[in-house]
Amino acid sequence: MADGEDIQPLVCDNGTGMVKAGFAGDDAPRAVFPSIVGRPRHSGVMVGMGQKDAYVGDEAQSKRGILTLKYPIEHGIVSNWDDMEKIWHHTFYNELRVAPEEHPVLLTEAPLNPKANREKMTQIMFETFNTPAMYVAIQAVLSLYASGRTTGIVLDSGDGVSHTVPIYEGYALPHAILRLDLAGRDLTDSLMKILTERGYSFTTSAEREIVRDVKEKLAYIALDYEQELETSKTSSSVEKSYELPDGQVITIGAERFRCPEVLFQPSMIGMEAAGIHETTYNSIMKCDVDIRKDLYGNIVLSGGTTMFPGIADRMSKEITALAPSSMKIKVVAPPERKYSVWIGGSILASLSTFQQMWIAKAEYDESGPSIVHRKCF
């Protein structure tokens, strides 16, 4: 490991919606593409096109009309290993253009990822891609590192799942981790529904992408939802217009804050679950009473679904209402939080002290996939 200074480790953060990949030491991922694999619906429709049996990422997205699309990662956890292998292959060879047998690879995993899954990831890296070394790190822990902390509670909310993960001195506390199956994709679906009620038609998966863009560009979180609703009825101050790809212009008003309000009130889309504020509070309450103060003072937001303007103030307000009155609450929303898992991985993999933490190929050959539980925790 220590012989070549030029051997940059690779960092690959596999999300439900997007893969973020790049080189350790960089400040942002080089490649960000959708976690999708598409296969042709009919063989031979594209005669002379040199048709492939599978397309990955952006190419699958652009050819979606003739493909059946699959998302190999569901709710943050890999559910289809053949397709996952295709995504990693695409990441190394087409996006980063590297030979994986020449670089250590740091992969990320969802909190509470089943043991068999970590073993499978390890096995694929060493046996299919022949990596010299690899490591698996928990996503939320990397986000906390990226914010310069080792203790705190991370609310990580992406496209497929949200988690609250209390971390003390660098270690996640598994008994207090809570999962909420409410994330970006649900908000996009909810906005599609709201816009359909208003007479706009968004049904296909291609149109879902348009709605996702509307959500990302225009949605925000109200500090006081009821008051914002009242304001929107009498004033046009919240109205914004959005031009669709075909030139049609739609106007959206209260939908801008109604859509992400679901994060705080999941009952709005018929979900019986606590909102993100209450889930965070419940997670803190599952921790030892002595560390709660440190958690309340270091609530770190991470993931694309925490990018809504107004989210930090609202979180702070809601948690202050739940916590003991003397407690100091601090919600941290780093501007780069969309990629903070990847950034944390980049930081970790480039630390000199981390170099002895890698699982080397020799160790894997000796112990098999279960080595991952001894070396990555």
UniProtKB/Swiss-Prot annotation:
Family annotation (PROSITE patterns): ACTINS_1, ACTINS_2, ACTINS_ACT_LIKE
EC numbers for this chain: 3.6.4.-
Keyword list, A-Z: ATP-binding, Cytoplasm, Cytoskeleton, Hydrolase, Nucleotide-binding
Chief localization: cytoplasm
Record bears the keyword Mitochondrion: no
GO cellular component: a single term: cytoplasm
Molecular function as annotated in GO: ATP binding; hydrolase activity
Listed Pfam families: Actin
Keyword ATP-binding applies: yes
Signal peptide: none
Domain of life: Eukaryota
Localization per record: Cytoplasm, Cytoskeleton
Catalytic activity, reaction form: ATP + H2O = ADP + phosphate + H(+)
Protein purpose: Actins are highly conserved proteins that are involved in various types of cell motility and are ubiquitously expressed in all eukaryotic cells. Essential component of cell cytoskeleton; plays an important role in cytoplasmic streaming, cell shape determination, cell division, organelle movement and extension growth.
Family in the record: Belongs to the actin family.
Note: There are at least 13 actin genes in potato.
Name of the molecule in the record: Actin-97
Organism listed in the record: Solanum tuberosum (Potato)
